[in-house]
Amino acid sequence: MRVIFAGTPEFARVALERLLAAGFTVPLVLTQPDRPAGRGMKLQASPVKQCALEHGIAVAQPRSLRLDGKYPEEAAAARAAIEAAQADVMVVAAYGLILPQWVLDTPPRGCLNIHASLLPRWRGAAPIHRAIEAGDAETGVTIMQMDAGLDTGDMCLVERLPITADDTTASLHDKLADLGGRLIVEALEMSACGGLPRTPQPAEGVNYAHKIEKAESQIDWRQDAEAIARRLRAFNPFPGGATQYGDESIKVWEAHADPAIAVGTAAPGTVLSAGADGVRVACGNGVLCMTLLQRAGGKRLAAGDFLRGFDLPEGAVLDGAASGGTP
């Protein structure tokens, strides 16, 4: 079976590697254009492009696939490449571009998407983050037959995965990437034998995983400690949690709710204690114990090491609404 692959980040690279290892022919890869990255802001190829080049696969990087859009020449060139590839199916994983109808219609077996949620829950751009943030007990991967809607196509394969109490977006991403790679191989093998099932998504339980914005990193100490801890796990590795003490900006990377400590009459954001085992802060309900922190321009440090270079006394008040420098 000939497979065009469309994807960009590490999540997609894992799937591409699994397809190649399973023996599928991939004549063409579509991925986002190279972007400036790193301290030097040099152009950097996506993980999928790097993988494709390592395997000698042709790469197309159009800025748009809309023939009537802003970049019609790039879209037309991509169309020619897609048609010339004579693929049976296209596999899409975190590509980052909307696929026009002509793309969906070109491969005889259509386009299969690897989506990191249990559809129809968490359609959209950030399903892993939002599942953790919401406190979901489980998530999973859905292999979907794409249509013109936003993650609205028929479900072909679904597999569930528990979300553990210490999962971050980083750790859950890796588990789901591995699961997605395995499931898409299964789906294509079933399709080759003519037996890939399709089930319409239920109308109930639809919600959307909106893109993560950097401004969401600001900690609101009026919230429940458990909710803040979930957000910090959801926003690790990006954008982290942010708070302010005086003129200093602090990033928070790891924390947990501490039910053993009473808030008393302390206002939300008040430091209750600060030691090697963590910085405990009063929240709207409960106490948050911060264990991995970072000051502007510094490294991520365990609480004890952080406090050796940063005075954060008991009774200090952190401001989750303030904005300061970005570490």
From Swiss-Prot:
Gene Ontology CC terms = cytosol
Enumerate the catalysed reactions: L-methionyl-tRNA(fMet) + (6R)-10-formyltetrahydrofolate = N-formyl-L-methionyl-tRNA(fMet) + (6S)-5,6,7,8-tetrahydrofolate + H(+)
What keywords are annotated for this sequence in UniProt?
Answer: Protein biosynthesis, Transferase
In this chain, (6S)-5,6,7,8-tetrahydrofolate is annotated as bound at: S117, L118, L119, P120
According to the record, the signal peptide region is none
Q: Name one GO molecular function term.
A: methionyl-tRNA formyltransferase activity
Pfam families attached to this UniProt entry: Formyl_trans_C (PF02911), Formyl_trans_N (PF00551)
Class of this enzyme: transferase
| InterPro entries in UniProt | Fmt (IPR005794), Formyl_trans_C (IPR005793), Formyl_transf_N (IPR002376), Formyl_transf_N_sf (IPR036477), Formyl_transferase-like_C_sf (IPR011034), Met-tRNA-FMT_C (IPR044135), Met-tRNA-FMT_N (IPR041711)
Output the CDD domains linked to this UniProt entry.
Answer: FMT_core_Met-tRNA-FMT_N (cd08646), Met_tRNA_FMT_C (cd08704)
Top-rank taxon: Bacteria
Its EC number is 2.1.2.9
Alphabetized PANTHER family for the sequence: METHIONYL-TRNA FORMYLTRANSFERASE, METHIONYL-TRNA FORMYLTRANSFERASE, MITOCHONDRIAL
Member of which family? Belongs to the Fmt family.
Q: What does this protein do?
A: Attaches a formyl group to the free amino group of methionyl-tRNA(fMet). The formyl group appears to play a dual role in the initiator identity of N-formylmethionyl-tRNA by promoting its recognition by IF2 and preventing the misappropriation of this tRNA by the elongation apparatus.
Name assigned to this protein: Methionyl-tRNA formyltransferase
Query: What organism is recorded for this protein?
Result: Delftia acidovorans (strain DSM 14801 / SPH-1)
